[in-house]
């Protein structure tokens, strides 16, 4: 799925992320909380969630808090990342990506900053893989770095585990979800204001049309049965 060996970064992943994002917000959990909060606003009643490309499982505690009754599965190709995720989230379930069968269907497949690590030529194939595991009426919700934001570009260019990154814009993500047979029902730009301007963050949802946010999200919904 990616040319970067995330096994070598699993132990130090959290500290590396903190170093990269400290200038934006010293509370590194803010980025994870933000995505899960936005996910919950898009799909408030999900009963089963796949954290696709879960890495070391940083989103899992926030997903569990937002969806206390849901079945939540984390999946990733990195064995070391999954081992770390299991250690820090011992009550949750993690499955290697190559063992993720199509017999289980999910209401939500959540992919947070995963697809820029996937080579462009296999992105459609990867979305088809996800689509096969989506329940009728379910959603694939993708968060990605916004290539139109120069600060985002700089952060990606200086991040050691983004060496393979090929950023994809919101339009590309939406088009690929459509090719996978999904209807785009929600999308927007996000993460506009750093911690120093946190008082302005309530304005974010009014600005989601503006292509200057540090990241963006796109939700593709499958037809109901």
Protein language model annotation of sequence segments:
Residues 1-43, 46-55:
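Conserved class I S-adenosyl-L-methionine
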Residues 58-99:
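Class I SAM-dependent methyltransferase SAM/SAH-binding core
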Residues 110:
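A conserved beta-strand element that flanks and buttresses the S-adenosyl-L-methionine
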Residues 124-136:
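A short glycine-rich, Lys/Arg-flanked "PGG" loop and its adjoining helix->strand segment in the class I
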Residues 137-144:
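Conserved beta-strand signature within the Rossmann-like core of class I S-adenosyl-L-methionine
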Residues 146-163:
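Short, glycine-/aromatic-enriched active-site segment of Class I SAM-dependent methyltransferases
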Residues 166-181, 187:
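Short alpha-helix
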